[in-house]
Structure formats: C-alpha cells, structure tokens
Amino acid sequence: MKAKNISYLIACMLMFCSLNTQAQNVFPYPALPDTLRSVEQRATYLSEHYWDNYQFADTTQLKNEEITEQGFVNFIDILARFNDEIAQKGISAFTAKAYAQKPAKEKFESLIEHYFDDPQSPMRNDRVYSFFLAEMKKSPYFDEAEKERIDFKWKAARKNLPGTMATNLSFKLEDGKMHQLSDYQNEKVILYFYDPECENCHKVTAWLKKQTIPAEYRMLRIIADDQISATYSIKAMPTIYLLDKGNIVVLKDCTPELLISVINNN
C-alpha cells in the first residue's frame, strides 16, 4: 500500500489531517485546535495526537486496511517531513498506546517491518525507523529477547544517517586500485554499491547512464563485499548514497529516481 497524495507542504497536510471526518472507513484524524497558529505548533500537535481517536483494542478496526494500514502509511509519510524533535514526540505517543494489546502489537510491528525494513519498500527511512526502534527498546511491552533483536536493528538504522559523516571504507574500483572514501572528501560523491551478478543492478545502471548527472558529482561504483555490506548495512543491490563534500551523507539508501531529482535540483 502506497501513501496517498498528501501535499508536500506541511501546512497543507495539516489542513487535510485536521478534517474530523465521520466516515466509517476513513482513519479518524484528530481535529487541530484553532488556537494553534504556527506551522510548528500544528505539526507538533498533529504528531502527538495523530492516534487519539484510533481504537487500538478494536480488532475489527485493526484488520481494516483502509483505516489501520493507510492511517499508518500517512503517519510515517508526514513524520519523514518533520524535524527530529517533532517526529520523536509523535512516535513516543504512538508507542505508549500501540503495544499494550497483543493483536495491535503484532499488527504494528508487522507494518513497521514491512515499510521500513523491506528493501523494496518505497517508504524506507532509517532516521524515522530508528526513532520507532528506540521507543520499542524502552517499552515495557517487549521482552529482553525482543529488545536484543530491536537493538541490533536500531544500531544498523543509525549508521550513516543524513547529516552525519559517512563511515570511511577501503574499496577497489574498476581500475583495480584500492581507494579510501576519505580520499574524496573534497568532492560530491555518489556511492553506488552493486553486485556484478545482480540483474537489478544492470537495469539501474543502464537507467542511470541515460540520466543527466552534473559534472560536479563523482560516481564511485563499488562491489559490495561482505565487509562493506556489514559496514553500510546493505540490504539489497544496488544501494545508493549521495555524499556532499566532507563525506557528509545527503541521501542514504535512496532510489535512483530520488538521486537524480536531488542532484539536478540543487
């Protein structure tokens, strides 16, 4: 299930979600108080109160994809547009309610894994995913074995997030020579991790060759061996990163379409 067409302007999204619809097959969005004037105030309120009208104990509602899954998809879609503080507040409020009953816990664990951990998901976002995992680690509704598994995923999700310096690594390019990522700190870099035998890699490579990539960007095509895959938590091939000068991560594990959009609109 994909996110519905929600405006990229946060203000418009807030107006949409503030409609307190009474339709039976629509997620019960909260009504935003008229006293909240600034976009930040409205975003914070929406984030914290998004699930106020949702009945986590109602198993019939829980099984309704148009309500539960679509509501969750829209939730994580807007969280990705909020800053860390606002997103974390929303996830904390969600966590306090979502896992108290076993059916809801199982349902939302499944949705979180599907939309954030599946390499084919178009909504992957390790920044937001790490916030969910951090709250799950603190929740009393997960046992120690579950928390150990969650902690492993949290550590992987926190690696090389946008805004941080990419982990240095040694790699061999097509010239047969060994290189260090740190050798390219003065350049804008596209890291293209691939497997020579990966059919999807061939398709993406062919597509990228048809695109316009500005001369200021250097593409490093790196065969992802086991060590590199572990260092960068690579889940599928190809995996693409965009780095600014200083090896600062701009995009982590992005789609080729997003890569081209960003580098041609900067």
Protein language model features and the residues they cover:
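Structural micro-motif
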Residues: Y232-Y241
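Non-catalytic, surface beta->alpha helical segment in thiol-disulfide oxidoreductase systems
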Residues: K245-N266
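Thiol-based oxidoreductase modules, predominantly thioredoxin-like and allied folds used
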Residues: A215-Q227
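Bacterial Sec-dependent N-terminal signal peptides
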Residues: M1-V26
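Oxidative protein folding and maturation machinery
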Residues: A23-N168, L173
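Short, acidic, Ser/Thr-enriched surface-loop or helix-capping motifs
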Residues: L173, L243-D244
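Short active-site neighborhood of thiol/selenol oxidoreductases, capturing the structured segment around
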Residues: K177-A206
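Typically the conserved alpha-helix immediately C-terminal to a functionally engaged Cys/Sec
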Residues: N200-P214, P256
